[in-house]
Amino acid sequence: MKLCKCRLHNLENESEETAMERRKLTKEDIDKVRNIEGFPLGTDEDIIALSDAPFYTACPNPFIEDFIKEYGTPYDEATDDYHREPFAADVSEGKNDPIYNAHTYHTKVPHKAIMRYILHYTNPGDIVLDGFCGTGMTGVAANMCEHPDNEFRMTIDHEMPYVKWGRRYPVLNDLAPIATLISRNYNADFDVTEFEREAEKILEDTKRECGWMYKTNPTEESQNSFVETQGTILYTVWSDVYICPHCGNEIVFYDAAVDSETGKVADNFKCSACGATLKKRDCDNAFDTYFDEKNNDTRRIIKQRPVLIAYQFGGKRYKKAPDDNDLSILSKIENMSIPYWYPSNRMCEGKESRRNDKIGLTHVNHYFYKRTLATLAKMYDLICKSEHADMLKIWFTSQIINISKMNRYRPQVSFPYNPLSGTLYVSSMVSEANPFNAYEGKIKKFSLALRNNAGNCSCISTGSTTQLLVGDNVCDYIFTDPPFGANLNYSELSFLWESWIGVTTRSKFEAIVNQAVGKALPEYQELMTRCFAEYFRILKPNRWMTVEFHNSQNAVWNAIQEALQKSGFIVADVRTLDKQGSSFKQVTAATAVKQDLVISAYKPKESFIREMVEKAGNEDTAWSFVRQHLSNIPVVVIKNNRIEVSAERQAYLLFDRMVAYHIMQGIPVPLDSTDFYRGLDEKFLKRDNMYFLPDQVNEYDTARITTEVENIQFELFVTNEKSAISWLYQQLDEQFCGPQTYAELQPKFMQEVKAVDKYEQMPELATILEENFLQDEKGRWYIPDVTKEGDLVKLREKNLWKEFEGYMNSKGKLKLFRSEAIRVGFSRLWKEKNYKAIVDIAERLPEQTIQEDSNLLMYYDISLGRV
């Protein structure tokens, strides 16, 4: 690939700043990384053409180590004085920034939101990593820390006066070649003048050859004395043709169902031949047979007819039905050959990518009408011959989806581009847009978005995050927004773009849930565990990773937590994104999956890890963990003039974190809950049911003098025994209702128990009270204090173990059980190192039960590897 002039202009300045010189990627370079996981599908020539070494390669980047040696700093625990608490401030950044909207890539995080995290966790000159970089917003954020816009800088200086401005150096990676190509252009020098000039020239040259295909004769009512003799088509509406199930008549859907005056689409429509009232689902599609010249075979494709043309003439817009001349032009186009290359790949395997096989869209070229394909092919031919091809290719791909057959015609919507995001859905009415208008409009948008690009201080790689070409303990911070469950099948959705650029995703290493390619939740979790383990290896000790999470399924949330913990990270803070106000609120895991999440996790110091191994089995490991964990949790977070209660500082979550860390690292859990809770009160300072280190408590007490603590009442849905116990703790809390009799509790409890989880054997209220609470002389149930709680816990666990033994002695699938008994049983079997029994019982439980309970999943997952 030829170097862009805009980049050549900057080589002189670049060589003064860094020893890294631009070079051409060679086949010898590619051979060094050919066996790296996630190496994309494509020829060496196509990979070399896309690449801009050493800063960007369309394959695993063999120069990352050189980049880190140039910009990074070595880690030494003896001299390291870094300390940060998790970022706990509100974040509100909209999605209307020009750079956010320049390309139609599937998902993006606003770069100004990421800047806040980078500024909080890093110093100028630090290395920032994102292994699922998408369009490179983490890189944009890192680079813009040097040159923010004035308004944003003033806001940050007011909200975060402690931050240090200055460039951070991003290392970006993604499995998708289209993502890294976009990332490169968003994080490189961008000569706006050269881009605009070349893009306009390409459009003009293409229009000279293909513009006639978008001309139409005006109707009599729109004719006037203007010099123009023809109008320019803005879009053409194509309608599916159905077959009446009663008489076999062909029905053009638009003619039968759309009110041309109001634009409303009727649910029911009549067959013009027999008068039967029909719905779309009652009818089969009609099909046409045609010769696919590129694939050299005859194919069946869904029958569509042009039904409406919107055009511009004399400066005004009009609509008309296609006339004989329009149909003649379309026929001429269908019979002509396209003299330029265009992709004709078979759509990749997958549920989404093959969803349109049934209507005849089996190959990439089938997703475009013939004149659109001819126009795109001419444009791309010119782009590939340009010395500015890298910039022009992202401009080219930015409108491919909008001008494809996926652009739905929505008569009551004025916006011209309406594909259904996150899918390859083709509607029964398609709006074939004029590509010249589409691309003309994007020129200024790209110029506006990229005019302030911060230069070449980034390193971008294309491959799997399961195997990054980076050394140990070299990265200062990680911000990552990985794929979550079955939210989006990225490789399938990117296939149209990537087919044009000639390099496609190797989906074997794509961390998603996709049953069509044999990836269920366990396979997803395994890939995410490997990715997080690679992050853990690369991140410096005592440093932070921020993970964005978007999924409503509890099982996926548990899989992510499991993957994080298994890789060695410790979660210190979880917050939800309130979509209405774009603000963050702290939550517990029980409600976490209902909103988007921001997870703050840290890598412990090496000395701490050594101590845990050396003292394994000693209760000191529990307290070492707590001390380290408390030091990484915010001391005071004030929201709405109230001190926020930190769930991470409360006894139950400290215990859960301690147990999980020990189990994940293969270290014996040294304390049961009773001894742990007693030890917390003895060894740490307690304020408002939260625990603090001695050097933290003064800061909290000072804030407490002037600020009240928020009054939290978590919204609890009683669906199983565990949530029932939590609800009772809330009811009996002195700050809520306090001690109550059975008669007072029972009606309220019955109101709360609206729907019990499937398979859950819910105990009677009396049983739950007897096993978890104490009764005073007036018959009121109350929460036991620490001195009396131990005996109660032991009695309860004895009863639950007895119940669990009954499950062990039974046969077949467990269809109804107490989940609390399963938890107690797994915990005891773990202490006895009876991993086989854990696996045996787990495999008799419903899959949903294991996947949606983080504790059971943890015991089962680790035991499975030890059987």
Task: Please place each PLM-identified region on the residue numbering.
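Conserved SAM/SAH-binding loop
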Residues: T135
